[in-house]
């Protein structure tokens, strides 16, 4: 595969699903898995899985299945260059508090280590072993802690302003839970999470594809 080859974006979006499933299999002591098993578990067409995995190199052989350890090693290298991903969250309202309390409890490699808000009554509060700091400290903290991934759960009217500050602080990835479609430079990746759209999509598939 050429050095400048890039895995398609659609395939990249499925990587975390594959990674989670394969990690579960590893925990059960399973050392190989075939595309049919993955397809049934994740509800992804087998042909799509085989095409996705064709981009990943020699992870298995036809009729023999994919090697779990090789898959885990590949997924880790693609999802992160380090074993531990430090994440910051900005906006500790109801959703922010819930995410901070959950704090990726089933993902050992990802941890929210910094939290920010502007409300005086919440600054200094310890939530899930993370102390909430004032938003004025965002740039200094992110730079000193080398954090380049942020979860954004602020009110939508300040989302773009906060995003601009994050870009200045060197952030390269934003998971945006606000309704605002924020704009960033091309080298900053933004994934928008809209619960309303996700529910509409779910209802559509229930209506049109349920047996």
From Swiss-Prot:
Keywords: Cytoplasm, DNA-binding, NAD, Repressor, Transcription, Transcription regulation. Homodimer. It comes from the Bacteria. One of its GO terms (biological process) is response to redox state. NAD(+) binds at residues 91-96. GO terms for cellular component: cytoplasm. The keyword Transcription regulation applies. It is found in: Cytoplasm. Transmembrane segments: none annotated. It holds the Pfam family Put_DNA-bind_N. Residues 17-56 bind DNA. One of its GO terms (molecular function) is DNA-binding transcription factor activity. Modulates transcription in response to changes in cellular NADH/NAD(+) redox state. Disulfide bonds: none annotated. Belongs to the transcriptional regulatory Rex family. This is Redox-sensing transcriptional repressor Rex.
């Amino acid at each position: 595969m050429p050095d400048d080859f890039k895995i398609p974006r659609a395939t990249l979006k499925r990587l975390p699903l594959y990674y989670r499933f394969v990690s579960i299999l590893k925990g059960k002591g399973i050392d190989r898995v075939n595309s049919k098993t993955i397809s049934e578990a994740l509800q992804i067409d087998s042909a799509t899985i085989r095409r996705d995995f064709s981009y990943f190199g020699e992870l298995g052989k036809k009729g023999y299945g994919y090697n779990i350890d090789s898959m885990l090693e590949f997924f880790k290298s693609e999802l992160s260059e380090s074993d531990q991903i430090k994440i910051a969250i900005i906006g500790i309202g109801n959703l922010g508090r819930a995410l901070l309390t959950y704090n990726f409890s089933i993902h050992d490699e990802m941890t929210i280590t910094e939290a920010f808000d502007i409300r005086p009554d919440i600054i200094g509060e310890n939530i899930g072993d993370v102390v909430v700091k004032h938003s004025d400290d965002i740039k200094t903290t992110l730079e000193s802690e080398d954090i380049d991934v942020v979860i954004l759960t602020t009110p939508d009217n300040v989302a773009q302003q906060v995003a601009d500050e994050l870009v200045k602080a060197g952030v390269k990835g934003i998971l945006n839970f606000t309704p605002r479609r924020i704009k960033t430079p091309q080298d900053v990746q933004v994934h928008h999470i809209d619960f309303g759209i996700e529910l509409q999509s779910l209802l559509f598939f229930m209506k049109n594809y349920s047996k």
